[in-house]
Structure formats: structure tokens, C-alpha cells
A protein has these predicted regions:
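Regulatory cytosolic signal-relay segments
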Residues: 2-54
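Cytosolic regulatory/linker segments at or just downstream of nucleotide-handling modules
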Residues: 170, 193, 200-244
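Catalytic NTP-binding/metal-coordinating core of nucleotidyl cyclase/transferase enzymes
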Residues: 46-130, 183
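Alpha-helical scaffold within the catalytic cores of cyclic-nucleotide enzymes
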Residues: 84-98, 119-163, 188-199
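Intrinsically disordered or compositionally simple regulatory linkers and C-terminal tails
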Residues: 43, 147-148, 241-244
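Catalytic strand-loop-helix junctions within cyclic-nucleotide turnover domains
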Residues: 112-123, 163-181, 200-203
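Short, surface-exposed loop/helix-turn segments at secondary-structure junctions
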Residues: 151-154, 175-187
Length: 244
């Protein structure tokens, strides 16, 4: 009798452990592909199209300068190796500073630093800027000492990025078709951040910060003046960390 009861308890325990292990594996996979916040929501069943919430956040939009030229000159495997090294620098910096990487689009990266994840709005802005500066530093180190798989690429050139940081309200949730959803952020603030990033090359800066983000920061910044953005009614003031 007692042995049979013990066997029964062991089966129940194994079943419970198995379910927990499956959930953990599923959580790890979702976190890897969607990010921690989005992955957690999907694991909890938030998979209805349109489900989500408005959030205030510092929005990060970045891309790789010269991507079109590189993609035309390099083979597919070489381009993938280069992008992986590049995204390792940028996404790693975002995650190091408690940001949420939402998606990679070609050479582009979309990330957020939700205010709710930080003690203050200032802390979120400081984290986003620290991540941007770390990403640029890591790219510099990559260019100076490329790993063997990058150094072996004949036609590669030093990697440069443009990063825009903007503050605004976005909708964080499921968008897409009934059979294919994407957990992302949308809204005017995302569009504005993308327009700002497009100015980084012409302004000669790797990091551009909008007035909305700069207002949270207590550190010297270069004032780059006001700039018109396509699709945005009023010109927007832009700032950047001082050049070294």
C-alpha cells in the first residue's frame, strides 16, 4: 500500500516537474525570439489580435550605415556573419541596460525602455542613452579588433550605426493577420523616432536624442537645432552627446 502510494506521488511529481520544465523551455524560446516582456505576455495567453496596452517609453530605432552597399557586395553567409556581430553589439547593450529588444528588420533594430520598468522617467532615459553609448563603443572595438570570421571577409568595412532615442506613448501589443501576429510597438512616436534616425548620417552623429528625451537628462548635450521631420507637423529639437 505505502509503496503504491509512493509510486503514485512520484508520478504526480514527475508530471508537475515535466510541465514546469516545458513551460520554462517555452518561456526561454519565446524570450529569445520575442524579448522578455513580449514573450511573457504570449506565454500567458495574450495572443488575441489587437490585445495590448498603451505604454510610455523611450523608443530606440537604429540601423547600419552602408547596409545596401554591403549587401550588394557580400555573399549571404558573410552578410549574416556581419549582421550578427553588429546586432550583438547593439542588442547586447540594450539588454545590459534593461531595455527590451522588439525586432530586427533587415539592418534595423527596434527597442524600448518602458518607463514602468524603471524607478523614474529620468532613469529610463539615462539607461537608453547609456545603452546607445555602449553600443557605439562596442562597435568601435569590433572594428579595431574584428573576430576571425569578420576579419576573413574580404570586402567588409568598419561598421557604423545611427541611433535615435525618442520619448512617447506607444501601443504595445499584437498586430497582424489572424494567422500571423507580431508583438511590437506602433504609434506616432515610433514613426518620429524612425524619421530622426534617418537624419543621423547627414548630421554626422551616431546618436540623436529628441527634446523629449533630453528633458529627462541631467548632462551636457550638443544642441543640433530644430529639424523638420516628414509626416511630423512641427520641427523637432535634436541633441547629441558631445563629440570626443
Amino acid at each position: 500500500g505505502e509503496f503504491a502510494q509512493l509510486q503514485h506521488l512520484l508520478k504526480l511529481f514527475a508530471l508537475h516537474v515535466g510541465r514546469q520544465l516545458q513551460r520554462r523551455i517555452a518561456g526561454d524560446v519565446l524570450d529569445t525570439y520575442l524579448g522578455a516582456a513580449a514573450g511573457g505576455r504570449v506565454l500567458d495567453g495574450l495572443i488575441k489580435r489587437g490585445a495590448g496596452e498603451p505604454i510610455r517609453s523611450v523608443i530606440w530605432v537604429s540601423d547600419l550605415r552602408g547596409f545596401t552597399d554591403l549587401s550588394e557586395r557580400l555573399s549571404g553567409p558573410d552578410m549574416i556573419a556581419l549582421l550578427n556581430a553588429y546586432f550583438g553589439c547593439l542588442a547586447g547593450a540594450v539588454l545590459d541596460h534593461r531595455g527590451e529588444v522588439l525586432k530586427f528588420i533587415g539592418d534595423g533594430l527596434l527597442a524600448v525602455f518602458p518607463f514602468a520598468s524603471f524607478a523614474t522617467e529620468k532613469a529610463a532615459a539615462e539607461a537608453a542613452l547609456a545603452a546607445a553609448e555602449q553600443a557605439c563603443d562596442q562597435l568601435d572595438r569590433l572594428n579595431a579588433m574584428p573576430p576571425a570570421e569578420i576579419a576573413a571577409i574580404a570586402d567588409w568595412h568598419p561598421l557604423r550605426t545611427g541611433i535615435a532615442l525618442h520619448d512617447g506613448e506607444v501601443f504595445f501589443g499584437n498586430v497582424g493577420a489572424p494567422a500571423r501576429l507580431d508583438f511590437t510597438v506602433i504609434g506616432r512616436a515610433v514613426n518620429a523616432a524612425s524619421r530622426v534616425e534617418a537624419l543621423s548620417k547627414s548630421l554626422g552623429r551616431s546618436i540623436l536624442i529628441t527634446e523629449a528625451v533630453a528633458g529627462h537628462l541631467d548632462r551636457p548635450l550638443d544642441d543640433l537645432g530644430r529639424h523638420a521631420l516628414r509626416g511630423v507637423a512641427q520641427p523637432i529639437a535634436l541633441f547629441s552627446p558631445p563629440l570626443a
